[in-house]
Amino acid sequence: MNNATFNYTNVNPISHIRGSVIITICVSFTVILTVFGYIAKIFNNKNNCTNNVIGLRKHIKCSGCEPFCNKRDDISSPRTGVDIPSFILPGLNLSKSTPN
């Protein structure tokens, strides 16, 4: 009365390959979109940064573009809240910015 045994020898290997390919394509698509969103966010925020090299401003507020900003003279108020890395939410701009 042992009818609950399963025979795995008749499993179609094509279905396993097809499932693996679908999962690989989905993961690759997500990674590519994340990378492109991160690169686009860097290039969009690079032009909005205030650079202190020319010495026109003392206060530097970097929101999402820290690699392109000089923060030595940053005396702005400390930031509060939770930072959301741009690689988690690509293309989503949660920082306060002035419209062009």
UniProtKB/Swiss-Prot annotation:
It is found in: Virion membrane. One of its GO terms (molecular function) is channel activity. The chain crosses the membrane at residues 19-40. The keyword Transmembrane helix applies. It comes from the Viruses. Pfam families: NB. Residues 41-100 are intravirion. It is a single-pass type III membrane protein. The keyword ATP-binding does not apply. Keywords: Glycoprotein, Hydrogen ion transport, Ion channel, Ion transport, Membrane, Signal-anchor, Transmembrane, Transmembrane helix, Transport, Viral ion channel, Virion. GO terms for cellular component: host cell membrane; membrane; virion membrane. One of its GO terms (biological process) is proton transmembrane transport. Glycans are attached at N3, N7. Residues 1-18 are virion surface. Putative viral proton channel. May play a role in virus entry. Dimer. Belongs to the influenza viruses type B glycoprotein NB family. This is Glycoprotein NB. It comes from Influenza B virus (strain B/Oregon/5/1980). The gene is NB.
